[in-house]
Design a protein with these regions (language model features):
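Structural signature of extracellular appendage/secretion-system components
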Residues: 1-300
């Protein structure tokens, strides 16, 4: 049973991760019936024609038209990414509610099983089957790090190393809401002190690997895919130095989030394109300097 549950819940983790990747691909491949790549190609071709005769109003208008179309499609993709983050967030809330509902049901089953089997005359097999099914479902949502039955027939469960179910009750998982974007973070209510603004997180999202067996559970995968915020090109830079993130910091940061990384990459494309075009058409630095030093120059 343990081996089956381990593989089953690992599948839940990667299935949820795969869905986010597929969503990104879908938005890039088709926006209003046209691939986003086509909008980039059309803009490139428009500039090719413009370069042949910049004074031609037809070429000028074509650039304006294709640039406007590119920006509108880019905005649609970006909005699609952010909307999907909200969808993931709603799913996380649903999953947290389901985990708590399972905990409540298991408390009831524990008590009923204990009452029936107290005399050591009969086994509450039907109730045990129900409890096993709930354990399977729970294992698909979160990483059950330990579960065992005591001599009284009561099942004890730990989630992510913290006690979830004991002989008396279950410990509820709360959802801390970010006021900026309304993204939720699961936390242990019994280990937190809200009055002191201290919330004990259920999941450690910085140390996930197949080697340690921490790549388990749908909620964790959804949290990673969603990330903790919306992103733009600035998220590839270090807040202190202003330079590009080191590969190590990148891997520990937004690289773990499918949606945040995709948003930052898309915005980087738009940013560099806009800056380079403006630096060519209305530069405040020599054009040769832009190309020679591969700079991102401010513009007016």
């Amino acid at each position: 049973d343990k081996a089956y549950r381990t593989e089953s819940v690992r599948h839940s983790f990667y299935d949820a991760s795969s869905e986010a990747v597929q969503e990104v691909i879908t938005h890039l491949q088709e926006t209003d019936g046209q691939a986003f790549k086509d909008a980039i190609d059309d803009l490139y071709k428009a500039f090719e024609e413009f370069a042949k005769d910049p004074s031609d109003t037809v070429n000028q208008n074509l650039v304006l038209q294709k640039a406007s179309l590119f920006l509108s499609r880019a905005k649609a993709v970006q909005t699609g990414f952010e909307d999907y983050q909200r969808i993931i967030n709603s799913k996380i809330i649903e999953d947290i509610d389901r985990v708590n509902a399972i905990g409540k049901e298991m408390v009831d089953l524990n008590k009923r099983i204990q009452a029936i089997e107290a005399a050591h005359v009969e086994k509450a097999m039907n109730l045990r089957d129900q409890r096993d099914l709930l354990l399977d479902e729970l294992s698909g949502l979160v990483r059950v790090t330990n579960y065992e039955e005591d001599v009284n027939g009561v099942l004890h469960i730990d989630i992510e190393g913290a006690e979830f179910l004991d002989e008396v009750t279950f410990h509820e998982i709360g959802a801390l809401v970010d006021k900026k974007n309304e993204f939720v973070t699961p936390y242990w209510t019994h280990l937190s002190e809200p009055k002191k603004d201290y919330y004990y997180p259920v999941f450690d999202l910085e140390a996930i690997s197949a080697t340690t067996g921490s790549d388990i559970g749908e909620i964790k995968a959804l949290l990673l895919a969603r990330g903790d915020d919306w992103c733009d090109y600035r998220d590839f830079y270090d807040d202190v130095t202003g330079k590009y993130l080191s590969s190590d910091n990148y891997e520990k940061g937004i690289a773990n989030s499918t949606m945040m990384n995709s948003e930052a990459e898309l915005d980087t494309l738009i940013h560099h394109l806009a800056v380079n075009v403006n630096n060519i058409l209305s530069p405040i630095a020599e054009v040769g300097e832009i190309y020679t030093n591969n700079q991102t120059i401010s513009y007016v």
